[in-house]
From Swiss-Prot:
Biased composition annotated in UniProt, kind: Low complexity: 7-16, 62-79
Gene name tied to this protein: Rtn4
Cytoplasmic-side segments: 1-989, 1126-1163
The Reticulon domain, residue ranges: 976-1163
Protein name, per record: Reticulon-4
Protein source organism: Rattus norvegicus (Rat)
Summary of the function given for this chain in its UniProt record: Required to induce the formation and stabilization of endoplasmic reticulum (ER) tubules. They regulate membrane morphogenesis in the ER by promoting tubular ER production. They influence nuclear envelope expansion, nuclear pore complex formation and proper localization of inner nuclear membrane proteins. However each isoform have specific functions mainly depending on their tissue expression specificities.
Tissues and organs where the protein is expressed, per its UniProt entry: Isoforms A, B and C are present in optic nerve, spinal cord and cerebral cortex. Isoforms A and B are present in dorsal root ganglion, sciatic nerve and PC12 cells after longer exposure. Isoforms B and C are detected in kidney, cartilage, skin, lung and spleen. Isoform C is expressed at high level in skeletal muscle. In adult animals isoform A is expressed mainly in the nervous system.
GO biological process: axonal fasciculation; blastocyst formation; brain development; cardiac epithelial to mesenchymal transition; cell adhesion involved in sprouting angiogenesis; cell migration involved in vasculogenesis; cellular response to hypoxia; central nervous system vasculogenesis
Amino acid sequence: MEDIDQSSLVSSSTDSPPRPPPAFKYQFVTEPEDEEDEEEEEDEEEDDEDLEELEVLERKPAAGLSAAAVPPAAAAPLLDFSSDSVPPAPRGPLPAAPPAAPERQPSWERSPAAPAPSLPPAAAVLPSKLPEDDEPPARPPPPPPAGASPLAEPAAPPSTPAAPKRRGSGSVDETLFALPAASEPVIPSSAEKIMDLMEQPGNTVSSGQEDFPSVLLETAASLPSLSPLSTVSFKEHGYLGNLSAVSSSEGTIEETLNEASKELPERATNPFVNRDLAEFSELEYSEMGSSFKGSPKGESAILVENTKEEVIVRSKDKEDLVCSAALHSPQESPVGKEDRVVSPEKTMDIFNEMQMSVVAPVREEYADFKPFEQAWEVKDTYEGSRDVLAARANVESKVDRKCLEDSLEQKSLGKDSEGRNEDASFPSTPEPVKDSSRAYITCASFTSATESTTANTFPLLEDHTSENKTDEKKIEERKAQIITEKTSPKTSNPFLVAVQDSEADYVTTDTLSKVTEAAVSNMPEGLTPDLVQEACESELNEATGTKIAYETKVDLVQTSEAIQESLYPTAQLCPSFEEAEATPSPVLPDIVMEAPLNSLLPSAGASVVQPSVSPLEAPPPVSYDSIKLEPENPPPYEEAMNVALKALGTKEGIKEPESFNAAVQETEAPYISIACDLIKETKLSTEPSPDFSNYSEIAKFEKSVPEHAELVEDSSPESEPVDLFSDDSIPEVPQTQEEAVMLMKESLTEVSETVAQHKEERLSASPQELGKPYLESFQPNLHSTKDAASNDIPTLTKKEKISLQMEEFNTAIYSNDDLLSSKEDKIKESETFSDSSPIEIIDEFPTFVSAKDDSPKLAKEYTDLEVSDKSEIANIQSGADSLPCLELPCDLSFKNIYPKDEVHVSDEFSENRSSVSKASISPSNVSALEPQTEMGSIVKSKSLTKEAEKKLPSDTEKEDRSLSAVLSAELSKTSVVDLLYWRDIKKTGVVFGASLFLLLSLTVFSIVSVTAYIALALLSVTISFRIYKGVIQAIQKSDEGHPFRAYLESEVAISEELVQKYSNSALGHVNSTIKELRRLFLVDDLVDSLKFAVLMWVFTYVGALFNGLTLLILALISLFSIPVIYERHQVQIDHYLGLANKSVKDAMAKIQAKIPGLKRKAD
């Protein structure tokens, strides 16, 4: 019945929002037959719950339920969220839940006796029923999906005109619960229902509900039918609308629900509720509290008050009815819901649609939403009562924040004493009711603002952490149940689908309601709490982990679950979710659980610590918006699950050390990658079983390898952890790098390999452990990983202390091995550079002295750095070749290489240092060189750098100047020689012709005229060309720019070095000439003076024959002709010159012999 009712309720609830019925119809995938079956099951449960309904009816003064009226006072006392104690809810027939519940008690329910109705069945049913029941009286809701309407019919028979019941008109605007009229002690009734549910061992609470009996209605007062934010409103929905419809017989219940639905519209008419409902509807599931923008807190408070009264009066009976219905329906719904459950693909599609349809409520900060079966059903219920729930949830969220924490604590205590370990549900905790309408999870304490939701959730979590008594035992039971449930269709991702759909419904009441109903009907009732639990744990562990954008609401649920899981021992956002966790749901597989875990706590005010999860796992508070935005296109659940399973085995070993920090980085990963990574990481990190002995170890490990975890980004599926240990997956550094560096990296990789081996061991064990409870599955791996990592970390962490620029590694690091190796290299590098290395990095090259002689200090220092790793290097040298070094940026690679180059290679190149240092190699050239060449180039660059550093700035400048001067001199010399010898005929011809023309022009015109003409000729050429190019560009519409731009931008200034060079040379010649002339004119040597006199006498004749320009012309001609002639006839010319020289000497000897003075001087 529950399945049918839930689907129908979901349909009605989805219909109840103002959305057009056709949209809902289209979106509802649920089949009418399935819903009818569920309705029948629900009717059966209602029969069992008749007594509860009677009590509820009695408690429901305004509802006027047709069922046997139980005095409202008799119903659980007004459930005051603020009150510390929760009035015991009359148990009544709750224990006598319809056999359907026991029959189908999902594996998530640990024990029929202890099934804590995460949501009172009546409440769950009521939300679903109210939309339908209320629809006929008020405005008929858009025809729910086939599956939804049948459910509504059985649940909707208006047997008793409830107090102005909210009409399940299918419009959210119509408050499913009327604050003034119907908001009677609904809260107490929910509490009572919870108590009753706790008493009802036969009642099977939905996976999310079992462990949260107290959380069910108390925190879930705003159930799907009720405004998700308003706990009371939810309860009113469940109690006023649905409970009133609940009668001793199924028909009576249905009638009562119908009447309650009628009452609900009236209540919905409440201006406060009406205003808030539309807004709340969006929030009902994922954003119950945060999405209610329009709902004033005052209104929320009013709603809470009214609903509290109604709930107090009706809560017990309704709770009993709802609990029994919910408990039964969760049990029955697994089958019915399975029927209604759309294939995981459909559910994923629906979920995607919901995601797409998600509106403002995208916040989904409410992490309390756990993937309940009810959460799926919540979609159905949500449609009809979403608005009401949202409004009430909003009201209740405010009131609940203040009161619910105490009241829930008391309630949880009372409920726990009543045989339920679950803590009182927190109003902020959305409690999906198993019944179709109740299926959606609503946070009673959600406030209209996200802040209130977050505040409520976290305070409640903190306050009720003790209240939530789901212990590691419960977790284990859930795990066991989950293992069994994994095989069932529910194990498919119904949680994600249902939650997603329901969340989308909350967010977008118009378009999502359709999808949510279909998705809800398709979803298995139970959201494997185990999955949720694991998801919560991994999420808490990876709270900063990726959040699936499409999973916005799912993330909320998952987050809440993860928070509850993580808080599970310590604090829980929502007891109802805790119950969901405690009650393993057969629907979701562990991977799904883990995958949702990835979703971060929605904008959690403070990070929630998850005792069951390693303390390190506690996710730092992360804004939901920032987190959820990243994974926008989640893969289908099946794909995600498959990928997660595969990646789980492979990445568990790999990411375990990384999982702590990787979760945060994975925020952007797609759902699949998130699921896989989170699963891996979550399991690895949160693997520790209830005994937290491993957590401290993990914490130590995390501390020891924080940087590694930060650097490691393997969590994303892109990292392909399986390949991380294979050489193929590791980027190879060009083997041009020095062997020393290779050894260094290899030593690092060796360490990483050790870790990898441990991880691989874990990976081999993990596939077998996948079926094991989440906490237990990976503990062994954690230990092994810790050991491996701890062994490697001492050296790495010490080096890591050195400030490193991680950006350089981000591009190349994809695996632990790579990370370790690259990190090790950089650490060494940083130590060498930053700590003691005086060497500066020039041109992006860490310039190291190639020879130990040049840099004994650096070599010694580097050797010291290497000493710790020498053993590792020695070990690795044998097998290092198999592992390619991590390819790092050029600068980084060189930095890593240089230190070892000094140690290992400096001797090799020390002999060549003088020649090597002279040559400079560019980084690009070095990277292109072969290993030896690269080593040599590195050494050269090192030597060059060191030399430059050793030199004083002035020395360096002088050397640079001399170098440039030499280069320019060489260029000039080479060019002049080439010109004189006509090496380049064109060039020489141009120079020779221009020079000769200039000299000839000077013979005709004055130098001034020649200069002017030359300038005009030049300008005429340049201007003409400039205009020509401009015209061409205009015609071609090209934008080439100035034709002489290159020349204009080129440096034409004469360098100071060049000037100094030539000036120094000229100055020397001038000085020597002056000295010589002084000697000649002062007759230092009479003979030399006479020779000079004869020479001058000869020039007098030459001057009479030749003009100065003529001489210049002759000299120019000779300059360009004699060298060529001499080069071609050098032998002959040398022979004749020798003969001439000999004859001249002979003549001089004769003359000197005749002149005694000359002879003596010659001697």
